[in-house]
C-alpha cells in the first residue's frame, strides 16, 4: 500500500485528511518495516514539535482498524507496519531491526488436515528471528 491508497481509505470512510496523518503514513511507506509508536512520535516531532504520544497512538489504532497498517507484538510492545495488499502471504520479522521478509508459502491446507474437526475463519503466520543484516552486524 502507498500513501495515496491509505489517504483514499481515510476519505472513503468519511475521515479528515490532515498533513499529520499523511506524514505519519509516509513514515510507514518509506521505512517499510515494523515500527513502535515512540519511533513514529520521534520522527513526527521534527515537523510537529510537541506532538503527543496519545495523538500518535490514536491515529495508529485508527489506521489499524481501517486496514491501513498491520500490528504485531515484538519484544513486549506493539509494533506497526504499512499493510501489504498485493497477495496472500506471511512474514518473517527480524526481532532486532523490525525488518520483514515475505513468505509466499502458506501452510493452511496442512493445518486443515491436522485439525479436520475445526472451522478456520482466518489465519496469520509470523516467523520471528534475526535477519542476515543484523547477524552480520552482531
UniProtKB/Swiss-Prot annotation:
Alphabetical list of SUPFAM superfamilies matching this protein: Winged helix' DNA-binding domain
GO MF entries: DNA-binding transcription factor activity; transcription cis-regulatory region binding; zinc ion binding
One Pfam family in the UniProt entry: FUR
Principal location listed in the UniProt entry: cytoplasm
Keywords assigned: Cytoplasm, DNA-binding, Iron, Metal-binding, Repressor, Transcription, Transcription regulation, Zinc
Domain of life: Bacteria
Record bears the keyword Iron: yes
GO cellular component terms, A-Z: cytoplasm
Binding locations of Zn(2+): 94, 97
Region (DNA-binding): 1-85
Biological processes, Gene Ontology terms: negative regulation of DNA-templated transcription; regulation of secondary metabolite biosynthetic process
Binding site for Fe cation: 88, 90, 109, 123
Oligomeric form and interacting partners: Homodimer.
Protein name: Ferric uptake regulation protein
Organism of provenance: Staphylococcus epidermidis
Amino acid at each position: 500500500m502507498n500513501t495515496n491508497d491509505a489517504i483514499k481509505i481515510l476519505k472513503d470512510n468519511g475521515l479528515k485528511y490532515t498533513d499529520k496523518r499523511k506524514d505519519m503514513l509516509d513514515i510507514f511507506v518509506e521505512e517499510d518495516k515494523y515500527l513502535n509508536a515512540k519511533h513514529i512520535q520521534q520522527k513526527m516531532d521534527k515537523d510537529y514539535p510537541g506532538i503527543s504520544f496519545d495523538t500518535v497512538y490514536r491515529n495508529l489504532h485508527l489506521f489499524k482498524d481501517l486496514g491501513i497498517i498491520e500490528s504485531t507484538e515484538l519484544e513486549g510492545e506493539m509494533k506497526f507496519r504499512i499493510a501489504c495488499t498485493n497477495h496472500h502471504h506471511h512474514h518473517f520479522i527480524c526481532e532486532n531491526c523490525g525488518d520483514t521478509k515475505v513468505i509466499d508459502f502458506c501452510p493452511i491446507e496442512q493445518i486443515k488436515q491436522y485439525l479436520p474437526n475445526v472451522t478456520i475463519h482466518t489465519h496469520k503466520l509470523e516467523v520471528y528471528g534475526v535477519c542476515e543484516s543484523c547477524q552480520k552486524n552482531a
